[in-house]
């Protein structure tokens, strides 16, 4: 029996409308009744996630900003890592050949230079909102991460530009087909989960995890049992071909698997 279960949010635990389904909520509560520790491992901001777990009365550790922050059940910060200021400065003031919009995150929230109301659809359940500002006037100190949102092919070309400029000063990954993230070196959900599991006295082999995007790769590949969503990015399935693929987030597939696992732990699972 696993001691810790870690869940990505968008495309995994949440349905396509970015809401938490009733079956999923019920399955999570059953895990807690079995004394299995819950962790939400997400690219979302901790300010937003505090609202989410409060709304649903869930006791869960938080890995936020794709591994840049870890918070306890009580909201205590257990770990933090920021982008190197020179890397943040280079991104903020670079001249990038892209149509993608830039978004900057720090402990104060989410900041962008242009209104993108369509992006708020992913935050309807929490009400979390970007703050408009002149990004070139932002401090490069204490930046958690920077992300670019736009067309995937455009972002792939942008990634080449960013790699050429940043080199080994940052870690780049796709958290979705339309979102490219610039993170601190060595920062990912898997590394954060290793820190958290050690803090709790668990091994990664005693953890299970669920995800759908390339920012879940390290986490899924490092735990005892990693599960890929049926709706996952093709690149993730290709990178971790040995991991089982469950159903689609639109069908609350995580709850389907967990219900089977809790009720019939010794029987093989089929997503059908």
Curated annotation (Swiss-Prot):
PROSITE patterns, per the entry: COF_1 (PS01228), COF_2 (PS01229)
Free-text function comment from the UniProt entry: Catalyzes the hydrolysis of 4-amino-2-methyl-5-hydroxymethylpyrimidine pyrophosphate (HMP-PP) to 4-amino-2-methyl-5-hydroxymethylpyrimidine phosphate (HMP-P).
Name of protein: HMP-PP phosphatase
Domain of life: Bacteria
GO molecular function: 4-amino-5-hydroxymethyl-2-methylpyrimidine diphosphatase activity; magnesium ion binding; phosphatase activity
SUPFAM superfamilies: HAD-like
Catalytic residue positions: 8 (nucleophile)
Binding-site list for Mg(2+): 8, 10, 212
Catalytic activity line of the entry: 4-amino-2-methyl-5-(diphosphooxymethyl)pyrimidine + H2O = 4-amino-2-methyl-5-(phosphooxymethyl)pyrimidine + phosphate + H(+)
The protein's enzyme class: hydrolase
Stored PANTHER family: HMP-PP PHOSPHATASE (PTHR47267:SF2), PTHR47267
One of the Pfam families matching this protein, by short name: Hydrolase_3
E.C. designation(s): 3.6.1.-
Keyword Transmembrane helix annotated: no
Disulfide bond residue pairs: none
Stated family: Belongs to the HAD-like hydrolase superfamily. Cof family.
């Amino acid at each position: 029996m696993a001691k810790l279960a870690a869940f990505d949010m968008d495309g995994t635990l949440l349905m396509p409308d970015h809401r938490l389904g009733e079956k999923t909520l019920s399955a999570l509560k059953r895990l807690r009744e079995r004394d299995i520790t819950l962790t939400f491992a997400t690219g979302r901001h901790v300010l937003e996630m505090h609202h989410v777990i409060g709304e649903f009365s869930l006791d869960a550790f938080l890995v936020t900003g794709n591994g840049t922050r870890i918070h306890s059940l009580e909201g205590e910060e257990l770990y933090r890592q920021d982008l190197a200021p020179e890397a943040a400065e280079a991104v903020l003031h670079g001249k990038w050949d892209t149509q993608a919009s830039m978004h900057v995150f720090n402990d104060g929230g989410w900041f962008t230079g242009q209104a993108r109301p369509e992006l708020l659809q992913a935050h309807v359940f929490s009400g979390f909102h970007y703050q408009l500002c002149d990004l070139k006037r932002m401090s490069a100190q204490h930046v958690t991460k920077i992300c670019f949102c736009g067309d995937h092919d455009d972002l792939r070309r942008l990634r080449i530009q960013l790699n050429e400029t940043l080199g080994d000063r940052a870690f780049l990954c796709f958290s979705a087909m339309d979102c490219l993230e610039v993170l601190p070196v060595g920062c990912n959900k898997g590394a954060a989960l290793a820190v958290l599991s050690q803090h709790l006295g668990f091994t990664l082999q005693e953890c299970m995890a669920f995800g759908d995007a390339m920012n879940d790769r390290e986490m899924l590949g490092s735990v005892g049992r990693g599960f890929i969503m049926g709706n996952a990015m093709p690149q993730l399935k290709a990178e971790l071909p040995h991991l089982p693929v469950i159903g689609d987030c639109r069908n609350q597939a995580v709850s389907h698997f967990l219900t089977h696992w809790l009720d019939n732990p010794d029987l093989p699972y089929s997503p059908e």
